[in-house]
A protein has these predicted regions:
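Signature of N-terminal electron-transfer/Fe-S-associated modules in redox systems
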Residues: 1-171
């Protein structure tokens, strides 16, 4: 089904801190749009002061992390065709910032905690003399972690960090 010309309703969190509330928007969709395209169009046409963090629009930087209909996703990689299909007919698409992190404004959160925790992790220094082998299987196993783009969606979905008031103690 083509989305071109479809009018879609959105609810986007606007404001700062506790005073933030969902604001309603309607937008005409184009074929091939991603959620970030919609946010940019709302920003350009209706809300020029809307705060949103993004950088590459290619799924490489992780800056545009948000919750779309309650699911943590990258806005630049989430196709509107998928979101429209998942959203019950007549319901708006809801876009909120990540819940785990302190809310700054609109769709922007403070993710500095992640970097602070990383700084507290002591480096592992191996023995002076290399008396071990690093085989290809081990290299393949750790490669997955090198692919991290620091979008922090994994941290956002962790129920311990998300729901525990003292989540800093777990780091």
């Amino acid at each position: 089904m083509s989305l071109k010309g479809t009018i879609q309703s959105f609810k986007v969190l606007r404001g700062e801190g506790e005073e933030a509330d969902l604001a309603s928007y309607e937008l005409e969709l184009d074929e091939g749009m991603v959620v970030l395209d919609c946010v940019h169009r709302i920003q350009y046409e209706q809300e020029p002061d809307m705060a949103v963090r993004w950088n590459c629009k290619a799924g490489k930087c992780g800056s545009c992390s948000a919750e779309i209909n309650g699911r943590p996703r990258l806005m630049c990689m989430t196709r509107m065709s998928d979101v429209v299909a998942e959203t019950p007919a007549g319901q708006p698409i809801e876009i909120r910032p990540m819940k785990t992190f302190p809310h700054i404004k609109d769709l922007v959160t403070d993710v500095a905690w992640n970097y602070e925790v990383a700084q507290r992790i002591a480096p592992i220094n191996g023995p002076e003399a290399m008396d071990w082998e690093f085989n290809q299987m081990e290299a393949d196993r750790v490669q997955h972690f090198r692919e991290c783009i620091e979008c922090f969606l994994c941290v956002n979905t962790c129920h311990v960090l998300r729901d525990h008031a003292l989540f800093d103690d777990f780091a």
